[in-house]
Amino acid sequence: MTFEEKRVGHNIINQLPDSLLCEIFFNLPTEEVVKTSLICRRWRYVWQSLPGLDLVINGSKNYDKFDFLERFMFLQRVKLRYVGYGHNCRNMTSMMMNNVIKHKIQHLDVGSNRRYVYDRVEIPPTIYTSCERLVFLKLHRANLPKSPDSVSLPCLKIMDLQKINFVDSLDMEKLVSVCPALETLTMDKMYGAKVSSQSLLSFCLTNNETGYLKTQVVMQTPKLKYLKLNRQFIQRIVINDLSSIVMLNLDDVAYFGETLLSILKLISCVRDLTISFDILQDYRHFSKSKSLPKFHKLSVLSVKDMAVGSWESLLIFLESCQNLKSLVMGFRDYNWGINFSDVPQCVLSSLEFVEVKAREVADMKKLWSYFMENSTVLKKFTLCLDHIEDQRDHVMLSKLFTFPRRSNKCEVVVRLRTFGTYKPMSMFSCADGF
């Protein structure tokens, strides 16, 4: 590129209005944006009007180079990632955090990429008292100070806490309970014995590590609509009010201890359910000796990673779901000898949408025949495949789209996880990617 071409390009950018320049700068690393003040005199102060910043901070470097934080005028969104710590780093971290917090920001995302305990980010006490406008808070590998008697987070709606160190377990309970606008809470584990909130709509436990919750989970959340428990070994769960919960996600939950019947009671209140095949197995086992609750409200059911033998358990579970309209199944393996003679009432009379996720076409031939032949009101059957290997798979899919259906309104769709491995034929439709 010639000097003249560079000059023309520079002039074009320089003619853009400040508002558009801010949009461009907002998508660049913050340090690079600050450097633009050296390129053009007019840009010297534009970056100070940006509503957000995204910084990766190495604690071994000089913190003085970040003194530009004080010059932002309209700061609303801040993301800080610490990748290393140096001498006197903890004090400097608190100073930077205080500089950010005094801007009365609305969105704060702070974390450390370091795994050592002593490399956690130190959050200053001002997080409790000087964030009156804060709406979103995400902390990862951070140390939270002891909460004061008075905590002021009146606008906080979304809070995500991962690998946090509280001084006292009661601090977590207090932090949640004193946020009058809190709607969504996500944590990697229970940092206290209770979640109490009059405004909470969604609660997720996302821990990917196995282990027992040593304390019971107590939920005092009268407006809760969505509950997700992921890979938790739960000894006891107590929910004081079940009437508000609409969606329940128990994917990857393998053991409930003494609470299975309580969980089944919870399931009986929800309309949208995601469960692991372990729960299906337990339900089948207990159904032989106990009278278990029915799930008349359940409209949407998703079961992931179904293993050999879980089909029979699913059929028994479906017998208790007389009004089910949508069923999603993911198979990690398949048993050609499973029983297809039993047909639950919901398959016959209420099921409208079926989605099957599998590795190969051949595994699913009997399964799609089962739903096509028995479902009278089926509107859509979706088959999601990892791949299609050869011509035999194409022929088998052709049979799927021409297979007789008991419901004349049924649409058939095939989705492929990998692109370019399957070309749709004229007789049917195909959607790529899922």
UniProtKB/Swiss-Prot annotation:
Domain F-box positions: 10-66
Q: State the InterPro entries in the record.
A: F-box-like_dom_sf, F-box_AtFBL13-like, F-box_dom, FBD, FBL13/AtMIF1-like, LRR_dom_sf, LRR_FXL15/At3g58940/PEG3-like
FBD domain residues are 336-385
- The answer on whether this UniProt entry bears the keyword Repeat reads yes
Q: Which UniProt keywords apply?
A: Leucine-rich repeat, Repeat
Repeat region (LRR), residues: 72-99, 114-141, 164-189, 204-231, 252-277, 306-331
Coiled-coil zones: none
Instruction: Give the protein name, as stated in the record.
Output: Putative F-box/FBD/LRR-repeat protein At1g16940
